[in-house]
Swiss-Prot record:
InterPro entries, per the entry: Ribosomal_bL34, Ribosomal_bL34_CS
PROSITE patterns: RIBOSOMAL_L34 (PS00784)
UniProt GO BP: translation
Annotated S-S bridges: none
Organism expressing this protein natively: Brucella canis (strain ATCC 23365 / NCTC 10854 / RM-666)
Family the entry assigns: Belongs to the bacterial ribosomal protein bL34 family.
Keyword annotations of the record: Ribonucleoprotein, Ribosomal protein
Superkingdom of source: Bacteria
GO cellular component, one term: ribonucleoprotein complex
Pfam families membership: Ribosomal_L34
Example of a GO MF term: structural constituent of ribosome
Entry protein name: Large ribosomal subunit protein bL34
Length: 44
């Protein structure tokens, strides 16, 4: 059986990257929430 996690830097950036988050309203809310929590890393 093939494992579920097949790492790829491009896919990671496209799905969870900063630009992907900024593209949607929900994503912007995610970033805002992470900022208020004081997260060191906001996105992948």
């Amino acid at each position: 059986m093939k494992r579920t996690y097949q790492p790829s830097k491009i896919v990671r950036k496209r799905r969870h990257g900063f630009r992907a988050r900024m593209a949607t309203t929900g994503g912007r809310k995610v970033l805002a929430a992470r900022r208020t929590r004081g997260r060191k890393r906001l996105s992948a």
